[in-house]
Amino acid sequence: MEPHRVLVLNSGSSSVKYQLLDMRDRSRLASGLVERIGEETSRLAHTPSAGGGAEPRERTGRIPDHDAALKAAAEELAADGLGLDSPELAAIGHRVVHGGLRFSAPTVITDEVLEEIERLVPVAPLHNPANITGIVTARALRPDLPQVAVFDTAFHTTMPEAAARYAIDVETADAHRIRRYGFHGTSHAYVSRKTAELLGRAPEDVNVIVLHLGNGASASAVAGGRCVDTSMGLTPLEGLVMGTRSGDIDPAVTFHLKRVAGMSADEIDVLLNQRSGLVGLCGDNDMRVIRRRIDEGDERAALAFDIYIHRLKKYIGAYTAVLGRVDAVAFTAGVGENAAPVREAAVAGLEELGMAVDASLNAVRSTEPRLISPEYARVAVAVVPTDEELEIAEQTFALVGDRGPRFGQVDN
């Protein structure tokens, strides 16, 4: 039997998420999360396939590092008869947040590739080090197995220079790799393709505005399956209002905080990335809590919601102009998939752009892709659940199976 399983790893600074998929039918065989790595309160939650007969289980107690975390996950998989030593395992696919301009496609990890990911740490200091740790640990566990990097930034490498460049001194920008890279690309790729499927059309024939709204949030303009603009930039701080991030802000605010408030660069970093956005505006970053507070008459929560929606509308309008013709707007991720009031408010008043939401369709809760716009609307408005793990597995299996990466090539 040919190897047909892919293990997907998403290594964070203090956590590891994993999923094992059978690529014959794209089914999940098991998934899990190891969190609070390095703390006394470390926790591993493992969920076997619903049809496998095994029960979800949990273990607690200190897991000192990522090596121990991945070994613990491997033990749980082995307990379900899904060990990493199985000949059915084809590859391990790794989420890597930043691939710069070199990596425009999923890439088999070699020593050279790993060195290049390490060279990108200065532009992704919060994410790439953890991704590297996961790769090194997995390679040590299965040195004989293909390991594939799937980059969050890859989908956005098709942006034209006019969208990707900042209007700053070119020599300075090039010397320090300062440009707009974009993030959440794996989600944007998956959702834009699924939106085309929902419309019964080929991705090459569809222009989509994808709104990935989670605690982190980003928008993208996708023309014929290729990203032509996205809201995040050099880092995930740019763009939409997010759970704890400010999104777009006048750069002079940082100078002002340094000169007037005496804040250091690190303090400003923490302010804009961890103490801003919805949590900075009203103290909460859970949209369900914010909506409940609004219903109770909380003015701060109402203002935070209005600012969030205002920014969303600006990007929908801007990307309508960028695309020229919009066939669909797709909401995805935690807030986009579950917060009907956000979807309704974001599209309200955009009838002149051909966009509208049907209240009854918008109220339906489902895990399937679905339209929520009325039949008369010129632009389809959709809810399309994202599946980044499946997309990583698809791209990994396509590469290892010698069917070629989904988009682009590695620019050597």
UniProtKB/Swiss-Prot annotation:
Localization terms from the record: Cytoplasm
Gene3D superfamilies attached to this UniProt entry: 3.30.420.40
EC number: 2.7.2.1
Cofactor binding annotation: Mg(2+). Can also accept Mn(2+).
Gene Ontology MF, one: acetate kinase activity
CDD domains hit by this protein: ASKHA_NBD_AcK_PK
Residue numbers spanned by region Disordered: 40-61
Binding site for Mg(2+): 10, 388
One GO-annotated biological process of the protein: acetyl-CoA biosynthetic process
GO cellular component, one term: cytoplasm
Active-site annotation: 152
Main location: cytoplasm
Needed cofactors: Mg(2+); Mn(2+)
Binding-site positions, ATP: 17, 212-216, 286-288, 334-338
Entry keyword set: ATP-binding, Cytoplasm, Kinase, Magnesium, Metal-binding, Nucleotide-binding, Transferase
Keyword flag Cell cycle: no
InterPro entries listed in its UniProt record: Ac/propionate_kinase, Aliphatic_acid_kin_short-chain, Aliphatic_acid_kinase_CS, ATPase_NBD
Protein's UniProt keywords contain Transmembrane: no
Record's subunit section: Homodimer.
Family recorded in the similarity comment: Belongs to the acetokinase family.
Database matches in PANTHER family: ACETATE KINASE (PTHR21060), ACETATE KINASE-RELATED (PTHR21060:SF15)
Biological role stated in the UniProt entry: Catalyzes the formation of acetyl phosphate from acetate and ATP. Can also catalyze the reverse reaction.
Name the UniProt record assigns to this protein: Acetate kinase
Organism of derivation: Streptomyces griseus subsp. griseus (strain JCM 4626 / CBS 651.72 / NBRC 13350 / KCC S-0626 / ISP 5235)
Gene designation: ackA
